[in-house]
Each structure stands twice: as C-alpha cells, then as structure tokens.
A protein has these predicted regions:
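Nuclease-adjacent, charged terminal/linker segments that flank catalytic cores
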Residues: 1-88
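Generic serine detector
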Residues: 10, 16-19, 23, 46, ...
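Residue-identity detector for glycine
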Residues: 22, 41, 54, 68, ...
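Alpha-helical protein-protein interaction elements
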Residues: 23-26, 101, 207
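Alpha-helix capping and helix-coil boundary motifs
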Residues: 40-43, 123, 201
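Low-complexity, highly charged intrinsically disordered N-terminal segments
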Residues: 48-137
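Active-site metal-binding core of divalent-cation-utilizing nuclease and nuclease-like domains
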Residues: 104-182
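Mg2+/Mn2+-dependent nuclease catalytic core
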Residues: 153-220
C-alpha cells in the first residue's frame, strides 16, 4: 500500500524560449538525493559530482555495505507512476480536473517516457528533442493544454549542477488567464510513501516542494 502525493509549482512560459544544452544522463534522482540532505558533505559530493553514495561511504569506511536502494521500493514507485499515465493519463487528468488545476477542456496528453521506463520513446535524446520542441511551441502559438509525462531537459553547466539531464514527472499546461495569452506550466512531482492512512508528513511535503522549486529554477 502507498499514499500518493502529486504536488505542483508553476512558471509563466509566455516569453520563455531559452535553449538548454548539456550532456549528462538522467539526473532526476540526483536532485532528489540532494534535496533530502543538502547539509551533508558526503551527500553533496555524491549528488553534484555524480558519484554513487556507496562509493563515497566506502571511501570513508571500507566496511560500509554495498547495497543500494530497495528494488521493491523502486518497483512500487514505478508501478504507481505507470498507473497515473495509463490509458492516456485518464487517472491523472481526472485528478487535475477535480482539484481545478486544469479545466475540463484541457485534456491533451503527451508521453515523453523512454522505453526503459515503459514509454513510447526510444531514448533520452528523443525525449529531450520532443520536450524542447514543446517548450518552444508553448512560447509561440501552441494550443496544447493538458498533461505531459516525463518532460526531459538538458540543464546548462553552472545552473545547478554540472551539465545534466532533468526528467520532470508531470507537467500541466494551462491557459494564462491573467494575461489572456500564452500558457502557464505547473511542474509536478510524484511520490510514493508507506501507507499511513492517507497521512503524509510535513517534512516529506517540504522536501518535495523544495525539489519542485529546483525544477522551476531550471526551466526559464
């Protein structure tokens, strides 16, 4: 059992056309790791320099265990995320409509997941190309309004980490009603926690919000 949490923060895309470039692969989990404990020097080395935490730990203590994250925990999270975007993101779109993040008419869906994660795209390079094309179109005249799964971006060197690739779980695109033109996107982070009767701790929510803040910082 698990308690899902899908949280969002927004950024105006009306004038955002900045191109991003970089070379490192899939660093989403490094952002999660960094936010979990930003004050820890060993964690900082691991996340920023892309060194496995186990290697950092064994540098300090050669007897440190070699086991990584639980395969069961990873499978649980992957299964939950897949259920959200199944059948054209039926469950996710219904949830976004229910809470008012999207209007009923904003119901389009794009799936930028790679085949390794159960998606239709061949690799990260294809995901990056499609994601960048979408963002540029949103700054122009695109009429896409709805949900994007696994928007994938190259992060320029020096923005937050060395050159890296960022995969955002969920992006919602809606009309910019305040300005009457263009679009606003909201970045969402999908989390799974052990079942606590629907309760999610404030610290877990705070970490997720901090992580989404990094995503918003990376987008403009």
């Amino acid at each position: 059992m698990h308690t899902p949490a899908v949280l969002f923060r927004s950024v105006n895309m009306e004038k955002s056309k900045k191109s991003v470039a970089g070379s490192r692969r899939d660093t989403r989990r490094r952002f999660e790791q960094w936010v979990q404990n930003p004050a820890c020097g060993a964690n900082l080395v691991s996340a920023v320099h892309n060194v496995k935490m186990g290697a950092v730990a064994r540098r300090e203590n050669p007897l440190a265990p070699k086991e990584g994250q639980s395969v069961f925990a990873l499978a649980r999270g992957n299964n939950f995320e897949s259920s959200l975007v199944r059948d054209g993101a039926k469950v996710l779109l219904a949830s976004m409509h229910k809470v008012g993040l999207l209007k009923k008419t904003e119901k389009s869906f794009l799936d930028f997941r790679t085949s390794a994660n159960g998606g239709p795209l061949a690799d990260l390079d294809e995901a990056i190309k499609k994601s960048e094309k979408l963002l540029v179109s949103l700054a122009d005249t695109s009429t896409f309004r709805g949900v994007v799964s696994s928007l994938t971006l190259r992060i320029p060197k020096g923005v937050m980490l060395p050159e890296a690739t960022l995969i955002i779980d969920v992006v919602c695109v809606k009309d910019n009603l305040e300005e009457g033109t263009g679009a606003i996107i909201s970045v969402g982070e999908v989390k799974t926690y052990p079942d606590r009767g629907g309760y999610t701790s404030k610290s877990d929510l705070a970490k997720a919000r901090a992580q989404m803040g990094l995503y918003v910082h990376a987008l403009p």
